[in-house]
From Swiss-Prot:
Disulfide feature: 64-118, 82-133, 89-96
Keywords, comma-separated and alphabetical: Disulfide bond, Endonuclease, Hydrolase, Nuclease, Secreted, Signal
Catalytic center residues: 42, 149
Stated family: Belongs to the pancreatic ribonuclease family.
InterPro entries assigned: RNaseA, RNaseA-like_dom_sf, RNaseA_AS, RNaseA_domain
Localization per Swiss-Prot or TrEMBL: Secreted
Listed name of the protein: Ribonuclease 8
EC annotation from Swiss-Prot or TrEMBL: 3.1.27.-
Organism: Miopithecus talapoin (Angolan talapoin)
SMART domains associated with the record: RNAse_Pc
Length: 154
């Protein structure tokens, strides 16, 4: 009886898996800090239609983002959320903070299309949110902590 051969498929799958793992879900542009990218993706004091708001994000990442949430408050208010008590994030890090109450927000969900013609449905709601916060980097506002990731809408 001949020994079993692994063949090329497991190696190919491994290489493809490694390639996919290198592509972040929401790749930050190189010329922005994490906080600046957070602001671009999620802070929208005056509500705007998903089509135009998501077009602004797509021009940086050059693909249609599946889901995005916009917080309708100034960056300074979101940064204030970073001063609330630390809680665990979805990834179990302890640098998350929950907003003090429900806030106006818009969720944009991809329905069809390919970049640059992405189509979204929008959902408006008032809900608390959780953000991950880190110390500011050079070029960030001078808050003790700045938001860098929208972890969850509660």
């Amino acid at each position: 009886m001949a020994p079993a051969r692994a063949g090329c498929c497991p190696l190919l799958l491994l290489l493809l898996g490694l390639r996919v793992a290198q592509i972040p879900v929401s790749a930050k542009p190189k010329d922005m800090t994490s906080s600046q990218w957070f602001k671009t993706q999620h802070v929208q004091p005056s509500p705007e239609a998903c089509y135009s708001a998501m077009s602004n994000i797509s021009k940086y990442i050059e693909w249609c983002k599946d889901l995005n949430t916009f917080l309708h408050e100034p960056f300074s208010s979101v940064a204030t959320t970073c001063q609330t008590p630390n809680i665990a994030c979805k990834n179990r890090h302890k640098n998350c903070h929950q907003s003090s109450g429900p806030m106006s927000l818009t969720m944009c969900e991809l329905t069809s299309g390919k970049y640059p013609n992405c189509r979204y449905k929008e959902k408006h709601l008032n809900a608390p949110y959780i953000v991950a916060c880190d110390p500011p980097q050079q070029g960030d506002p001078g808050y003790p902590l700045v938001p860098v990731h929208l972890d969850k809408v509660v």
